């Protein structure tokens, strides 16, 4: 049974989940996510390192994810990496809906051995990425490290969030990237939590996001 076939929310609660498909001449991507999950993940993007990073998002963000992608990997990973980020961002936006009642802001500092990365985000409705990672190698395995920035640009633009990634320490590319994804996951979990004191209100003094 697929994750998307299972009852993933408590009885009487509105499901904060989405299924988004996106097909282009270069890729075919499907993303299912449940913001109120338990950290289950089934990711098959054709890019093993990216699948590993989605495991981190699911596990540390307590998001249930089901992701499949078929792309022109015979050329390189760029199109698939970006389009998976786009589709994931669209699914986040759909699952959040009008964003009523959420905390909105999230931040976390994650260590992984010598690496230390800070992430702060705001579901502001204003897409922005400040990227402050310095990755010392061009690849981790077969994954091009320059694709990390493209992945987060795609998420920020399509989930309409403001995202800051700041590397505080680190010399190992794998550790830096994984710490970034873990910190992003925890920030995402914080920002998307429902604040009972909001009572379904838009978390903005303007009344709109």
Swiss-Prot record:
The keyword Cytoplasm applies. Its EC number is 4.2.1.19. GO terms for molecular function: imidazoleglycerol-phosphate dehydratase activity. It is found in: Cytoplasm. PROSITE patterns: IGP_DEHYDRATASE_1, IGP_DEHYDRATASE_2. The gene is hisB. It comes from the Bacteria. Residues 1-23 are annotated as: Disordered. Pathway: Amino-acid biosynthesis; L-histidine biosynthesis; L-histidine from 5-phospho-alpha-D-ribose 1-diphosphate: step 6/9. HAMAP family: HisB. This is Imidazoleglycerol-phosphate dehydratase. It comes from Synechococcus elongatus (strain ATCC 33912 / PCC 7942 / FACHB-805). It is an enzyme of class 4 (lyase). The lineage of its organism: Bacteria, Bacillati, Cyanobacteriota, Cyanophyceae, Synechococcales. Signal peptide: none annotated.
